[in-house]
């Protein structure tokens, strides 16, 4: 929730369980109606379409963001992205919050690492405190338990139990004599519950060449889309560490760079056909994971845990909210350590927000004398940011003229 989306009582009217994303994103016929981000703010050009089969996309993001064994872990993943798309490409041109003077690369790396590490540590404390307190189950436990109970939709049908799985035609059904699983494994399964899903690691012998595929399995044998050696983390689900870490990191990157967008307006990660996936062979085509904004990557990380069967949606939203608060607070605290002098140069009240009203540097709603004094403190410097009103990376005469034109105006 961002303060703009209307609140809803029924989550199903807000979120499309089957297709993912908001219900409002889809047309009445079920096709996707969203257009993503219209224009790259760095190039001024429209983003090119990047259409990918959902079966490939779902599996790829589940593996890309899994961060399990032999990985940099969920917090470490965001350090990888920081290095890959911010620190290395912008070497020699780093400005804290995208404003002020250019900062030497090593200094910028150390200070950005401090801010991000602090946020990741605080998110871990919050997430695992909640996990320990609520001790909430994972999807694999819930689904298998409910499958053993039966179905909860129709009391007149076989195997009814109020704690069973709801029947969904084509997805969750009662096994009858004509069902392909009626005598699976030489055992009579008539009356049991079947689920149409990813069939799991039991159908994979050689991951490099085999695919489990999608089909009917006994619901009591349901698997999340993960490695058989690392299926579901052995600790409580609520709330999602991935969602908290990712939202906090995205908040940090926005403040660190002074922009909602990745440098250049697009970050991409290559995905090669039949090479990228580890759990099984795939994907079926070559494409790039793409994120225009930092929040795009954060949201994808959170979604990957739902589509991978590691978290239900209830684990996601509260974690994002905590990540939002932790990311901002940790960054502000880091600034008191790494840039106290620069904060004083900006009037002693911290850094100027990137979306400040032009000329209203102290954010009091009026372009006045105190703003003029703040501007004079930066005059002649090779800075970017709020004082650089002509976007020349130099605080000079043209910026002064703009300020004088705005002087006395209310914001």
Identify the residue ranges that each predicted region occupies.
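Acidic/polar surface patches and capping/hinge elements
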Residues: 1-355
């Amino acid at each position: 929730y961002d303060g703009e989306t209307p609140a809803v009582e029924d989550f199903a009217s807000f979120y499309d369980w089957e297709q993912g994303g908001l219900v409002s994103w889809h047309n009445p016929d079920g096709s996707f109606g969203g257009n993503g981000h219209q224009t790259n703010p760095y190039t001024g050009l429209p983003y090119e379409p990047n259409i990918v089969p959902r079966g490939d996309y779902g599996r790829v993001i589940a593996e890309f963001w899994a961060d399990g064994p032999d990985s940099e872990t969920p917090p470490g993943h965001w350090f990888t992205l920081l290095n890959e798309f911010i620190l290395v490409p912008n070497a020699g041109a780093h400005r804290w919050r995208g404003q002020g003077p250019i900062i030497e690369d090593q200094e910028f790396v150390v200070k950005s690492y401090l801010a991000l590490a602090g946020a990741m540590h605080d998110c871990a404390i919050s997430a695992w405190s909640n996990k320990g307190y609520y001790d909430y189950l994972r999807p694999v436990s819930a689904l298998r338990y409910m499958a053993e109970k039966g179905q909860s939709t129709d009391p007149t049908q076989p195997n009814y139990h109020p704690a069973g799985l709801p029947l969904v035609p084509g997805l969750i059904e009662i096994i009858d004599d004509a069902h392909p699983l009626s005598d699976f494994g030489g055992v009579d399964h008539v009356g049991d519950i079947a689920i149409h899903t990813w069939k799991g690691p039991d159908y994979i012998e050689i991951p490099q060449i085999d695919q489990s595929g999608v089909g009917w399995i006994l619901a009591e044998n349901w698997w999340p889309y993960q490695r058989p050696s690392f299926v579901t983390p052995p600790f409580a689900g609520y709330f999602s560490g991935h969602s908290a870490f990712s939202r906090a990191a995205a908040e940090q990157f926005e403040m660190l760079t002074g922009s909602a967008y990745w440098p250049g307006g697009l970050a991409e990660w290559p995905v090669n056909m039949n090479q990228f996936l580890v759990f099984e062979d795939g994907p079926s085509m070559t494409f790039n994971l793409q994120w225009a904004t930092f929040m795009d990557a954060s949201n994808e990380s959170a979604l990957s845990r739902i589509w991978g069967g590691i978290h239900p949606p209830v684990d996601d939203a509260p974690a994002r909210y905590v990540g939002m608060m932790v990311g901002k607070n940790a960054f502000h605290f880091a600034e008191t350590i790494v840039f106290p002098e620069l904060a004083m140069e900006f009037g002693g009240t911290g850094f100027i927000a990137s979306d400040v009203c032009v000329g209203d540097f102290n954010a009091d709603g009026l372009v006045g004398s105190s703003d003029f004094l703040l501007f004079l403190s930066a005059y002649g410097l090779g800075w970017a940011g709020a004082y650089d009103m002509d976007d020349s990376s130099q605080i000079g005469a043209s910026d002064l003229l703009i300020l004088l034109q705005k002087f006395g105006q209310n914001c």
